[in-house]
Amino acid sequence: IWQQYDHTVMGDTIQKPGGDSGVVRVHGTDKAVAASVDSSAVYCWAHPLTGGKQVVCESFRNLISVGAKPVAITNCLNFGSPENEESMGEFVECVQGIGEAAKYLKFPVVSGNVSFYNQTKDEGIKPTPSIGGVGLIKDYKKMITMDFKEIDNIVLVIGKTEGHIDQSLFARNILDEKNGPPPEINLFNEKNNGETLLKLIDSGLIKSAHDVS
């Protein structure tokens, strides 16, 4: 969609789609609005509660990675039949996960919609919550992108790396392993990592950033 849609309307797009977030300048100010859309069907299928948290955190990371302070989210929740106990259970746990993450990160859900009965015959789709997030950049000149700027740039990892591969593309597509839980979410660490990265971007100490998801 983003390859076909005219994303340069009025010439205010300063970071095009395809990165962590798209960014649009606000006319007459130094401010800019960042936006991202994320989903987590595989994680939610493996563990709906954790998957719900994951998709909110993914949006949170994508906005922060361009230098935007996350402001609010909307959602589109796609599930199978609510008359099926398993599908309804997935829905309840996923919504709980979204709520817990949004509340802790102070990243409120301001709108959304639910789509049930997404199925073929009696088999429902994987639980698929989609999150649209928006964030604010106070000075668009401080916005950053994910690409390296110089040959000798130093690469830093913010946060813990625990080597989790269950439910990853590598596990599913290379190892053909479909079982196992998604990565655990530590909301305290998510918030602290995000705030740290925003401070680094605002101070001009880093030139590029990209989330690891």
Labelled PLM ranges:
Residues 1-213:
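Glycine/proline-enriched, intrinsically flexible loops and inter-domain linkers
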